[in-house]
């Protein structure tokens, strides 16, 4: 079901640039026909089932409660962040991430409160796909994995296994598992409602928009927000124009 969460929207980052790196090729999508079919399936399920439930949840659930729920699940996922910080050779960050997890798991009442940020232990976003990128693996073909992941790639797909194995929820059995998992899905989808609306209103082709936004956000994460300038074309650049430059502060 993670896909249905991500099918809605990966990220708005990067939509102000045109990627022309190296050969100038667009995102490799040799499986586009199958990917589009999977996207359509997820989008249909989302609109028919998950989105209405998430909208109701967002309306009736107080914001502080939703923040606490989000913090709780972010904290559970953070073991994956810690491991991949170390695997990428970010030792100082790995120690900070470990301390963040310990503080939020204890003083933060199981992660419901984000006390770590208040004391300067900032949240990071690392996963095995980023680790493979740091190790030199290319992204490979774009993949859309229905029901469990959503936008992905050949390089990012293995993170499904590693993030699952490192998530404590994986080892919960019995009647507790299903309601907790359902809460995670619904809360995550509710957090994406505004982004979904923007995507649907702005994109002529939501599939392509989702794909390009995902791939550009992955580049952003891999480079820790410091993207290389080579290979990116400034869409505002026009050497033949006499118009004054637009300055955004």
What are these regions (language model features)?
Residues 69-72:
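Beta-rich strand-turn-strand
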Residues 17-23, 135-249:
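A structured, mid-to-C-terminal "fold-capping" secondary-structure block
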Residues 30-63:
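Post-signal-peptide N-terminal segment of Sec-exported extracytoplasmic proteins
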Residues 75-150:
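Mid-length scaffold segments of soluble, non-membrane domains
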Residues 12-33:
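Bacterial Sec signal peptide processing site at the extreme N-terminus
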Residues 2-12:
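Bacterial N-terminal signal peptides
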């Amino acid at each position: 079901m993670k896909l249905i969460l991500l099918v809605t929207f990966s990220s708005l980052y990067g939509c102000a640039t045109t990627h022309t790196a190296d050969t100038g090729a667009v995102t490799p999508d040799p499986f586009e026909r199958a990917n589009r079919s999977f996207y359509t399936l997820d989008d249909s399920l989302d609109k028919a089932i998950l989105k209405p439930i998430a909208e109701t949840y967002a309306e009736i659930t107080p914001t502080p409660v939703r923040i606490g729920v989000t913090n709780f699940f972010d904290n559970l996922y953070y073991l994956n962040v810690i491991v991949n910080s170390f695997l990428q050779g970010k030792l100082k960050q790995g120690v900070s991430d470990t301390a963040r997890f310990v503080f939020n798991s204890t003083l933060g009442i199981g992660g419901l409160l984000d006390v770590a940020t208040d004391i300067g232990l900032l949240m990071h976003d690392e996963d095995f796909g980023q680790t493979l990128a740091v190790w030199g693996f290319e992204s490979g073909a774009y993949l859309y994995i229905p029901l469990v992941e959503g936008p992905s790639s050949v390089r990012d797909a293995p993170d499904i296994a590693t993030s699952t194995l490192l998530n404590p929820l994986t080892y919960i059995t019995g009647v507790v598992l299903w309601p907790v998992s359902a809460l995670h899905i619904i809360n995550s989808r509710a957090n994406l409602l505004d982004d979904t609306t923007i995507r649907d209103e702005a994109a002529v082709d939501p599939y392509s928009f989702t794909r390009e936004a995902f791939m550009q956000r992955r580049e952003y994460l891999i480079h820790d927000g410091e993207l290389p300038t080579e290979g990116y074309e400034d869409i505002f650049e026009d050497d033949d124009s006499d118009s004054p430059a637009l300055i955004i502060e």
